[in-house]
Amino acid sequence: MSAPRIGVLALQGDTREHLAALREAGAESMPVRRRGELEAVDGLVIPGGESTTMSHLLKDLDLLEPLRGLLADGLPAYGACAGMILLASEILDAGAGGREALPLRAIDMTVRRNAFGRQVDSFEGDIAFAGLDVPVRAVFIRAPWVERAGDGVEVLARAAGHVVAVRQGARLATAFHPEMTGDRRIHRLFVDLVTGVV
């Protein structure tokens, strides 16, 4: 079987780190900035960044509705931090003044932006992750958390009593940044979701 082609939405965030992590996890990876690139991938990573800015870049580049359509048609997706926020069906504290974060509605969950606090409240720690024997080193930067996980959404990890990782079908989301550590198990899990191994 050939390696899946997985795109990384390259509007903001740790694009290079995600591209490298996906390659190390066995995928062919490519940056995605245009509709044609979006339509050429088997799966998509939405990295961290600023969710309101990313939403409006998607809109300005005419990617928002095509991406929503591809997700509705079943495109596998993984969102980290701001990516988790965007994959949600509902966003709390989404922003104001016409600059709100816009939900892609790919995972049936309600996510609260910046739930763990501001930049100064960023932290890291080891957390248990469903299906993995050894805890994951999780880096949280102005991280969200999941306030509601819908039916069919599997909770994969918690931190400080809050849900910070979920899966729904071939959709994965984490409130933390696995690309910032050398641990490739989260990216490998997403590659397996794209190829249908899990």
UniProtKB/Swiss-Prot annotation:
One MF annotation (Gene Ontology) recorded for this entry: glutaminase activity
InterPro entries: Class_I_gatase-like, PdxT/SNO, PdxT/SNO_CS
UniProt pathway: Cofactor biosynthesis; pyridoxal 5'-phosphate biosynthesis
Recorded catalytic activity of this chain's protein: aldehydo-D-ribose 5-phosphate + D-glyceraldehyde 3-phosphate + L-glutamine = pyridoxal 5'-phosphate + L-glutamate + phosphate + 3 H2O + H(+); L-glutamine + H2O = L-glutamate + NH4(+)
Residues the record lists as binding L-glutamine: G49, E50, S51, R113, I141, R142
Claim: Hydrolase is one of the keywords in the record: yes
Annotated catalytic residues: C81, H177, E179
Signal in keyword set: no
Documented EC number(s): 4.3.3.6, 3.5.1.2
CC annotations in GO: cytosol; glutaminase complex
UniProt keyword annotations, A-Z: Glutamine amidotransferase, Hydrolase, Lyase, Pyridoxal phosphate
GO biological process: glutamine catabolic process; pyridoxal phosphate biosynthetic process; pyridoxine metabolic process
Gene3D superfamilies (alphabetical): 3.40.50.880
Pfam families linked: SNO
CDD domains in the cross-refs: GATase1_PB
Domain of life: Bacteria
Family membership noted in the UniProt record: Belongs to the glutaminase PdxT/SNO family.
Record's subunit section: In the presence of PdxS, forms a dodecamer of heterodimers. Only shows activity in the heterodimer.
Function per UniProt: Catalyzes the hydrolysis of glutamine to glutamate and ammonia as part of the biosynthesis of pyridoxal 5'-phosphate. The resulting ammonia molecule is channeled to the active site of PdxS.
Protein name (Swiss-Prot/TrEMBL): Pyridoxal 5'-phosphate synthase subunit PdxT
